[in-house]
């Protein structure tokens, strides 16, 4: 039965029962949430629930979601959200990337929203907070956890107004100054928030979750990572990335001794260079009929009072300053009078300021009706003592300022010029009316008579209430009204005492007496244009602000300093300079200045660069052996060396700006931030987010600038690609590694990333790139443009302990940045041997690289023909040592190709292979993701080589795997035979090596490697036999020597070129036709072909000398990297 029907009939259960059930369930849920929060926080007091704000509504912010449970704290998994509680992504957010989300204003919280948006777009901090990579003390990281939840919600598009309200409650709980809905300074809140995060994470090593760096990363960054302070476990995240040091040096002018003091800073407060004057126009009022008004331009001091302006006007008019009255006159009449003690900044540039001169008392001097220029002359030559013997104001004679208005009250409009009269307060209304008509007689029609017109107007005292400020025409003495007395008693020092009166005319009377009146044009003097040009919109550069910050200042005499060396008070020279630079540089522009009780906001346009801010000129210059300053901070962050050595340590890129709009008494905060996904700028005005052009970022309201060091920008950030290196797609962003992303949110992010974006380029996974490898000379500094340091590696890209245990201690993470400039065109591909030549030695691994290369080849069929000239280049210095230690490369000289006339065709094929890099029939290329085009060695399983008579075959272990019934002898056995006469101590060593290699297990030998060695060594043995029969004996050489004499090398090279090698004619010709050349390795287009591929390192009999070509470093083939034999470090 329907409950409503049952209740109506008096049957069924009562209606309040379901409501009591819901209330009981809600109470139980609150109890469970409170119990869970107390168990997580330990002994900390329970957090008060979020109080509903009167500003929380559906109209502002565009959110209509009901309040949900509190977000999970950073670093701990929160409760699962019900399917229906997740906020849906609005269609308007589809065009914006993640992170471009507004924040609701909870009542004058624009300062908080702007700072949170700037911190949310800080790449390092956003990844650190959103992924929960911090370890905070229990119960004391509530502000940090709420900030992390808010940042995570902004990037996952799960923001609700409740999250920002809870963050504000946490801020109010730990910062009493931010309670309520009062306005606050954004810089004050930023410094408080960073200090609070530092305190929350203090005591933990860097504030990070305990995680061990890979050995190669820890070895590289050992010198770059700041050392820990001696009194703590290590610097927090805020100290490591936001904090740096500045040096204050005090130099004695007598002995030139310098005393240095080092202090930390979170932001650099830069003074804005001030113009000492500003433009202001004042209209001078003359009593003459020919010229009534004249506007003059003045350059008034910025920090001054109205007394200075009164003095300048008096000097411009040639009158005493005590006779000048300054008032503000608008189209609706008088507004206010200016007195000497008022701040000059109360007068804006566009205010209409009028200056009146009070005529002197009768007998003391008169004013001329014809001013010459701006001066009022001639005056009677009276002395000052005579002129000011009597006061300008007495009880009976008062100075009155009049202005004519059409209408009454605030709707009145002014017509005609204002005028000044000095009258006795005892006059009647008729006398006062005739005095006023005499002043406006020049504006009246000629046929109108001013006699017997009755009451034409009403008079009102300006500055008082309209109800009680009108003078009565029925009074015998209307100027003795109490309103006039009150206006005279409200005066302050500055100019003669006066009373402002408004004469209000009726519209019909005005039309009958004056007709159609037009506003009189005010003439401008030449000084107006001249001062306007001199005071155009003031602007300066950020570099000028830094120069003003670091300029030298001499102490005043009252602030003299006692030099410890001279023991005398000296006016030392103080200079501030930056000692170290942080990863995140926060610059505060001092727009609010206060001198005494006067405060003002500077609207100077500070031109700051969006990218490439060079901080090298503002860092203290010091040599490489200089020591850091005393104290614990010197050991925390070591000083950087010369700026010319590491230029990337001094380049910064802008990513956020906090703006202030308004005045010092009240204003509004907004934020301009660059998104790390698309690299575009967005304007954040509370809940409103709009796209912004780069030329709109620099405004007069810029208050706080956020810069990030270029070599500390994460590689996944779009700001990285803007600076010259290659950025990755959304899959490399830390946002995709957020474990709380569900499938729908992840799909929406991926669908957004599928839109075309020019800044999303693919990052190569291999550390070898198509550009030329930078070689490093011994003792020099390797120069690589735009190389990112260890600090630029993303925090979440470090290998987990589980992956390290699975891959072994030498597992290296793939590099995610490019060593080349983004705009540089990729050149020809390079081989692996050139990569090894750059001294970047690969880590040894237990897995063979042959299966990897075979799979990477994409299943291409390779020819199974042997190589008759398969060689690897020999190195210059350590060739003998490498061969003696068991290197896998077997170098041969390219001059061996001249042994037979039938090899002439091979030279042509080599030349053709060098010019044609796309020969797919002979060179099998690897996929582009390896970027290492190499030639895969063919197998010799189908070849049946001819053996010379008398040569016995040595059985090869594991030869059945190759598929050949007869195999050539092992390399060690062949070397034993060749060096049997080299000396008494050589044969046992070679025998022991041969025995060790024969006892080696089959699993350690790669099939492709030994296939290559069998064919190469068999052909070498055959050629050695023929060469030995025809070559004359030579003095023996020692295998222990690493080099041969130049005479022996030249003699052997000449002998090899002249030997015909007649016994191998048919055999070598047949092998050359059937085997592809292994020398068809692609060369860089910019490098010319070498004269000889490599030097010879064959093992010969003692009577044979070894020939060497151009000495070069050995180049190892890819197939030799799968072996376990360690390579000497000097060979690279």
Swiss-Prot record:
Disordered as annotated region, ranges: 1-103, 839-891, 935-1008, 1024-1044, 1057-1106
Active-site residues, record numbering mapped to chain: 110, 668
Record's compositionally biased regions (Low complexity): 29-44, 63-78, 958-967
Skewed-composition ranges (Basic residues): 17-28
Source superkingdom: Eukaryota
Residues where Asymmetric dimethylarginine is found: 746
Location of the USP domain: 101-710
Keywords attached to this entry: Hydrolase, Methylation, Phosphoprotein, Protease, Thiol protease, Ubl conjugation pathway
Designated name of the protein: Ubiquitin carboxyl-terminal hydrolase 43
Species this protein is from: Mus musculus
Reaction equation(s) it catalyzes: Thiol-dependent hydrolysis of ester, thioester, amide, peptide and isopeptide bonds formed by the C-terminal Gly of ubiquitin (a 76-residue protein attached to proteins as an intracellular targeting signal)
EC category name: hydrolase
EC number(s) recorded for this UniProt protein: 3.4.19.12
